[in-house]
Amino acid sequence: MTGLSRRNVLIGSLVAAAAVGAGVGGAAPAFAAPIDDQLAELERRDNVLIGLYAANLQSGRRITHRLDEMFAMCSTFKGYAAARVLQMAEHGEISLDNRVFVDADALVPNSPVTEARAGAEMTLAELCQAALQRSDNTAANLLLKTIGGPAAVTAFARSVGDERTRLDRWEVELNSAIPGDPRDTSTAAALAVGYRAILAGDALSPPQRGLLEDWMRANQTSSMRAGLPEGWTTADKTGSGDYGSTNDAGIAFGPDGQRLLLVMMTRSQAHDPKAENLRPLIGELTALVLPSLL
């Protein structure tokens, strides 16, 4: 059996366990040490580093690992950029119906929506959806231009209580993820604060927060969902870059009203900028932590 096949079997087993756990009430089992041991084993197995924050927003139960380890933010910044656009619209500074010209000369790689609209106009709402649901990089750059550039994402992060996240560059340079480079980085702890604020807190008004959640529920790039039982879904934003950098952050929603804040940041320790992304690991991590949070 190949390594990938073994991983898929393990994810399937963990999802089954999560489905059982999701239906069990009462006190949670003791989990901190066993989960921590399993996370360390996953790091050894795949030669990766894992930053994780997972919390039940109703009970307060949580699991953490390498909370303050620095990771490349990659496309998880798009959640903040879209939230800032919504905030500006709420304050009357812009309108979501404002139209933006998509210049073919400004297209960057991984822009499936804007490539098809090159030479035409898109509304800010459409750009938000493209950035959040397809991780469209040109759409993200147009949102950055609207809100004031990368520094505006850093400022927004600070305004919602995230004291660590910083965005320095534009797509696609921000995904270089060079080990030790502080540019365009965050931590699991910081993103947990920020994503909780924009999706479950008061960073946005209820209507704007609801719109952001709806957009993110329609995400087509989610890695978390592979680790969730039937009946669950997410409002999340992925990110990936060099050195195997692979992230996912957002909220998982259960069929009985459960809400779990999940932030997973990973990278390879192989020192290879072309290292394979770790999307399957994100699903595996989701399935691993879910039963212990319920």
Curated annotation (Swiss-Prot):
Keywords recorded for this protein, A-Z: Antibiotic resistance, Hydrolase, Signal
First-tier enzyme category under EC: hydrolase
Catalytic activity line of the entry: a beta-lactam + H2O = a substituted beta-amino acid
Disordered, as annotated region: 226-247
Superkingdom in the source lineage: Bacteria
Alphabetical GO biological process terms: beta-lactam antibiotic catabolic process; response to antibiotic
Active site per UniProt: S75 (acyl-ester intermediate)
MF annotations from Gene Ontology: beta-lactamase activity
UniProt xrefs under InterPro entries: Beta-lactam/transpept-like, Beta-lactam_cat, Beta-lactam_class-A, Beta-lactam_class-A_AS, TAT_signal
Binding, substrate: K237, T238, G239
Effect of A82S: In amoxcillin-resistant strain
E.C. numbers: 3.5.2.6
First and last residue of the signal peptide: 1-32
Processing and modification events after translation: Predicted to be exported by the Tat system. The position of the signal peptide cleavage has been experimentally proven.
Gene3D superfamilies per record: DD-peptidase/beta-lactamase superfamily
Family listed: Belongs to the class-A beta-lactamase family.
Note: The class A beta-lactamase family has a specific amino-acid numbering system, sometimes called Ambler or ABL numbering and often misspelt as Amber. A multiple sequence alignment was used to derive a consensus sequence and then the consensus was numbered taking into account insertions and deletions. This allows use of identical numbers, e.g. for active site residues, despite differences in protein length. UniProt always uses natural numbering of residues, hence there appear to be differences in numbering between this entry and some papers.
Name the record gives this protein: Beta-lactamase
Native source species: Mycolicibacterium fortuitum
